[in-house]
Design a protein with these regions (language model features):
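Flexible metal-binding regulatory segments at protein termini and peripheral loops
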Residues: 1-118, 122, 219, 235, ...
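Conserved catalytic phosphorylation-site environment of P-type ATPases
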Residues: 276, 372, 382-458, 614, ...
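Signature of the cytosolic headpiece of P-type E1-E2 ATPases
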Residues: 466, 475-588, 603
Length: 736
């Protein structure tokens, strides 16, 4: 695994889904490539390969040989992508303008002035520049693919326009061929030119619409400053962001975006972290506090010591995750890819069959009809609509989720979320604030002076979230110092134990209390009932088999938890709560939230087993926790969801990360997944229906019934509209 790398490269010169398939097939054939996929909507190649066998330069060389190009240089890669997209759009715009300037008079001659002298020759002269100068890219693209034994949309456009033009050219210079047979020598120069004009117009609209699908990622990238001021040998200098190094001292002034992740080395201020945490209130930052790249300094100037720079910052990782998710393929896309891979050859076969049937059934009188119908079949067929149906919906859906602080790892996660019927919620840090405080102390007997010192020392070594509450409370008391423990051991799911001056001390749940055979007095038991019935957790502190104290710990329920549970139920999702707290505490919390099913006293293994049991019942389970603990349950769940709270830890362990502590993001995430998958199905349905209905009509299936024969010009307009309509439908999700 150490020699394997995964990279994403922008792809240039792709025109359709067939192009994406060609690039993908080319790269997959290279030695050392493990997996490769091309996203037509984002024009991105994602490839996993062995570094010892292959280099980005060699990948690019193979793609160039196939008629396309890659941007492999890491420096300013996104800027280059944007620049190339802008150039492509500008070129397309001028081609569209130029083509229509010639097409309009061509249509006038073909429809109104067809009987004036030299009308055919004038139409030919007007059509040639449209074919050569404005539509030349279709012909060169088709020729490159033909040399490789492949085909794409360029092939369809080049063949259809060439057939119409060459047929017209023959009729212009050899009209006697038809006159001798009692037939009229029709010309279709306008068809060849209008096809190119419409296809170019469609591609222009498609490019513009596709650009709008990446709005969310551009907003995220806009949070990255281009330059930073650093202190080098006591002198302040401005450098490009790419040249920052770990350990650099970075100067940030009021109103500026922070360029790195790091700690405040000097100064203090308030920082707007809403882009990551979702919290609108600026956070006070003092010396030693952590700050994140992309957040905004509100007030004073300060100096940061860089800890993570470039691609290692939380913001950069969020951007990379969103880009990778947008470029991933939904399960249904694998089927679509297979269809688009054979789409053009099948259409070519249908076009040939169409011409043969017309001539066979109708004889020489129907040669013109046969040619027109074959041209219409070639023109109306659209692999682009199929190729764009899934990725554009994914781009908009995942981008919208990111803008709402929901990070979805890939298309598979999005698809799985739609199927979830049970959500399992860990209590601490998910339903509650995750900032517990010690609210009550019950001492079983008179305290010895060192008891609190031992308790403080033991809890300072513990990683359990409740330990912090005890540490904070003890540190507020005077004269308490952590004892020098002889040993320390963490007991998974139960607590901790430590030795001090020949005695074994323990701190943890009532399960640890039982393990040490300690008992609770009647008086303490009565107080315990009151504490736990109010939703407080209980921590037991003892020495050997003697209970020394019970500490009541309160972790407030989040303000949005009850509403989130209600909304999930409205969506038809069952809710379960898991907690390591006792039965009374769990009952009190679940009752307040309206959760009927819960499991108390749950160890990590118990939580994993609970998820497994639900799955054995045929349920699709989503596990929601803080992204740090309960890794077993997360790994088992059909969908793993972590409450990230603005950290990068959760991004590594979950399929979905909620970047803020607001639990209302959870029902939003499920709703968005359903909307996105529904949109994908809509797009695919209309793309398939369009081709299933359009191709037979273009072939002339309605002609025997009502004499209707589809004009190639209308066929080209329909083809252009089909792909644009798919993209526009995807964009509608962003407005919901």
């Amino acid at each position: 695994m150490g020699n394997t790398t995964k990279k994403a490269f922008p792809v240039l010169n792709m025109h359709c889904a067939g192009c994406a398939n060609n690039v993908e097939r080319t790269v997959k054939k290279l030695p050392g490539v493990i997996e490769a996929s091309v996203n037509f909507a984002t024009n991105t190649l994602t490839v996993s390969y062995e570094k010892e066998q292959l280099t980005p330069g060699e990948i690019r060389a193979a793609v160039l040989a196939a008629g396309y190009d890659l941007i492999v240089e890491e420096a300013h890669k996104e800027e280059r992508r944007e620049e190339e997209q802008h150039k492509r759009y500008t070129r397309l715009k001028w081609k569209v303008i130029g083509a229509w300037i010639l097409v309009v008079p061509l249509l006038v001659y073909s429809m109104i002035l067809m009987h004036v002298p030299y009308s055919n020759e004038i139409q030919m002269v007007l059509a040639i520049p449209v074919m050569v100068f404005f539509g030349g890219g279709f012909f060169t693209g088709a020729w490159k693919q033909a040399k490789l034994g492949r085909s794409n949309m360029d092939t369809l456009v080049a063949l259809s326009t060439s057939i119409a033009f060459l047929f017209s050219l023959f009729n212009t210079f050899f009209p006697e061929f038809w006159y001798d047979r009692g037939l009229e020598p029709h010309v279709y120069y306008e068809a060849s030119a209008v096809i190119i004009a419409f296809v170019l117009t469609g591609k222009l609209m498609e490019e513009r619409a596709k650009g709008n699908t990446s709005t969310a990622i551009r907003k995220l990238m806009g949070m990255q400053p281009k330059a930073a001021r650093v202190l080098r040998n006591g002198v302040e200098e401005e450098i490009l962001i790419e040249k920052l190094q770990v350990g650099d001292l970075v100067v940030v002034r009021p109103g500026e975006q922070i360029p790195v992740d790091g700690q405040l080395s000097e100064g203090d201020s308030y920082v707007d972290e809403s882009m990551i945490s979702g919290e609108p209130v600026p956070v006070e930052k003092k010396k030693g506090d952590k700050v994140l790249a992309g957040t905004i300094n509100q007030r004073g100037s300060f100096i940061i010591r860089a800890a993570q720079v470039g691609s290692e910052t939380v913001l950069a990782r969020i951007i990379a995750m969103v880009q990778e998710a947008q470029g991933s393929k939904a399960p249904v896309q694998r089927i679509v890819d297979r269809i688009t891979g054979i789409f053009v050859p099948v259409v070519l076969g249908i076009a040939i069959l169409t011409f043969v049937l017309w001539v066979t059934i109708g004889g020489s009188e129907y040669i013109s009809y046969g040619i027109l119908s074959a041209v219409s079949v070639l023109v109306i067929a659209c692999p682009c609509a199929l190729g764009l149906a899934t990725p554009t919906a994914l781009m908009v859906g995942i981008g919208k989720a990111a803008s709402q602080h929901i990070l979805i790892k890939d298309a598979v996660a999005l698809e799985q979320m739609r199927k979830v019927d049970v959500v399992v919620l860990d209590k601490t840090g998910t339903l509650t604030e995750g900032h517990p405080t010690a609210t009550g102390w019950l001492w079983a007997q008179s305290q010895e002076p060192h008891f609190k010192d031992v308790l403080l020392a033991a809890e300072m070594k513990s990683e359990h979230p409740l330990a912090g509450a005890i540490v904070s409370a003890l540190q507020d008391e005077e004269k308490i110092k952590p004892a020098a423990l002889d040993s320390f051991e963490s007991i998974t799911g139960k607590g901790i134990k430590a030795s001090y001056e020949g005695h074994t001390y323990w701190v943890g749940s009532h399960k640890l209390l039982k393990d040490f055979s300690a008992t609770v007095s009647d008086v303490m038991a009565e107080m315990l009932v009151l504490y736990e019935s109010d939703g407080n957790g209980s921590i037991y502190f003892g020495r050997e088999n003697v209970l020394l104290a019970i500490i009541a710990v309160s972790d407030p329920i989040k303000a949005t938890s009850a509403e989130a549970v209600k909304e999930l139920k409205r969506q038809g999702i069952d809710i379960c709560m898991l907690t390591g707290d006792g039965q009374r505490t769990a009952l009190a919390v679940s009752s307040r939230l309206g959760i009927e099913r819960f499991v108390a006293d749950a160890l990590p293994d118990d939580k994993a087993e609970f998820v497994r049991e639900l799955q054995m019942q045929g349920k699709k389970v989503a596990m929601v926790c803080d992204g740090i603990n309960d890794s077993q349950a997360l790994a088992l769940a059909d969908v793993s969801i972590a409450m990230g709270k603005g950290t990068d830890i959760a991004m590594d362990v979950a399929m979905v990360t909620l970047m803020t502590s607001d639990l209302l993001l959870l029902p939003k995430a499920f709703q968005l997944s359903k909307q996105t998958v529904k949109l994908i199905h809509q797009n695919l349905f209309w793309a398939f229906i369009y081709n299933l209905i359009g191709i037979p009509i273009a072939a002339g299936i309605l002609f025997p019934l009502n004499g209707l024969l589809l004009n190639p010009m209308l066929a080209s307009a329909a083809m252009a509209f089909s792909s644009v309509s798919v993209v526009l439908n995807s964009l509608s999700l962003g407005r919901k």
